[in-house]
Swiss-Prot record:
Natural source organism: Drosophila mojavensis (Fruit fly)
Complex formation: Component of the eukaryotic translation initiation factor 3 (eIF-3) complex. The eIF-3 complex interacts with pix.
Domain comment, as recorded: The RNA gate region regulates mRNA cap recognition to prevent promiscuous mRNA-binding before assembly of eif3d into the full eukaryotic translation initiation factor 3 (eIF-3) complex.
Region of interest: Disordered: 530-554
Keyword vocabulary terms for this entry: Cytoplasm, Initiation factor, Protein biosynthesis, RNA-binding
GO cellular component terms listed in the entry, alphabetical order: eukaryotic 43S preinitiation complex; eukaryotic 48S preinitiation complex; eukaryotic translation initiation factor 3 complex
Tree of life domain: Eukaryota
Pfam families for this protein: eIF-3_zeta (PF05091)
GO molecular function: mRNA cap binding; translation initiation factor activity
Encoding gene per record: eIF3d2
Gene Ontology terms describing biological process: cap-dependent translational initiation; formation of cytoplasmic translation initiation complex; regulation of translational initiation
Region feature (RNA gate): 291-305
Protein name: Eukaryotic translation initiation factor 3 subunit D-2
Amino acid sequence: MSHYAPFIKPYIEYNQFGWGPCDVSDMEVPYQPFCKSDRLGKISDWMLPVQDKKYTNKYASTFGSNNSQYAYFHEDDDATFHLVDGGNPRALKPYQRNRYRPNQRNNVRLHGRYVRGNAMIGVGQGGIGGSGGAGAGNKYGKGRDMRRGYAGRRFMRNAPVRLRESSVLVRSDWVSIEEIDFPRLLKLSLPNIKDGIDIVTCGALEYYDKQCDRINVKNERPLQKVDRIINVPGTIDDPVIRRLSKTMGNVFATDDIIATLMCCTRSNYSWDIVIEKLGTKVFLDKRDNAQFDLLTVNETALEPPQDSEGSINSPQSLSLEATLINHNFSQQVLKIGDQEPKHKFEEPNPFEEPGVELASVAYRYKQWQLGDDVVLIARCKHNGVIKSPSGELQFVSIKALNEWDSKAANSVEWRQKLDSQRGAVLASELRNNACKLAKWTVEAVLAGSDQLKLGYVSRVNRNDHLRHVILGLQQFKPQEFATQINLNMDNAWGVLRCLVDIVLKQPDGKYLIMKDPNKPMIRLYDIPENAFDSDGNEDEETSEDRPFLKSMAN
């Protein structure tokens, strides 16, 4: 038995005072790298064949990720087995060099500007990419925002795509008096303003053609060009306002100027209004040769028109097209003819010229009491008149909405939805033209119109901006329509009274209210008397106004 190795009994530690293993030293114990933050479920690395694509390292160990102890290796039993593809082979796209190289952080070209590191050359603070340059998207300057365009567009969703131009160039000699942002204006209120009192009524109105109410998409009617003129002079150029200003009132304006101020919180484009203060009298007027009377198109849309100036869909071209459509439509839906009856007011049209055919329009010069010391006199207008079933005369304000390109405007197709879903079409227009519709409503309320007629006019072809068709009409009561579009007249009167009070506190002179082109605020400037004179010479209209203004000051 001596040639066998001796049997040595192993040492077994017996726990005499408790249950379970005894204390054993950690010597020669196998060690597996681990991390306390590792998720439980290590076995899923080799049990589940599907990987988590969103969190690829969800179950990977921080310190032992390179350890292949638990890795699964697949071994093919039959190396000669091949799977035959029976589908149609897809043509592979050619390799595009430098198609996506997010790791090149230096010398990245952004929309015609160069970026070096985290500094952008050619773009100031607040420009493309913000103040952090290309690396402003996240911590490392790449990732989700890099895939969207290197410029951190996640933080620019509400920023204007293109900086808008100001309606008038602010000169160095203009003095800024006040800056009022829209949130402050929205908190204003002037309740219990009574309806205006008629002082003078002028002009003549033609009757509305009720057959136009039958127009629909299937029975459309071509829009005709009406060779008529509507004179829209400014406040100071109005002879009736000049006459009334000598005996009554201390604030004078027109309905479109008042509507612009009342609805300023809904506007995006820049506009300006000239103010003449003479003692206790204030004249709100518009500049000569300005685009104040032109209608805007898709001003409040998410993507307003941004085509170049020469295009038919540029903001300037669309504005002129909408103005002409509105003028022609307001006359075509009336009963035109020498034999047709007309409703004449007390005085004739004050802007009548010999040899010129005037459009159907009547003017009401009305007076409002805006407090103890503010009396407003404004010129308002009607476009037509209609007889109700009871035989009562009702005055009508006629306006037209125009469709130019539903795909480019991202709006509803009128020819498909106007007859069946007219509410959806109107909702789309309220979203894209909120400011324009609000101003039309304010003008109808100020004039005391009984009805507001809205026409839907579309292009015959989206590429032809000269031919149009009428697809339908819709009528509203101005007060009810103001409630539907969330137009608060108490706030509108409060905004007007606030601006008038600011001007009344200033010394006599010339001022200008301007909507900031890129910020939701309005600015008040003190400007020289000859601020808008070309080459230092006054034009004929301005020279005629000087004696009147001097007489008012005296």
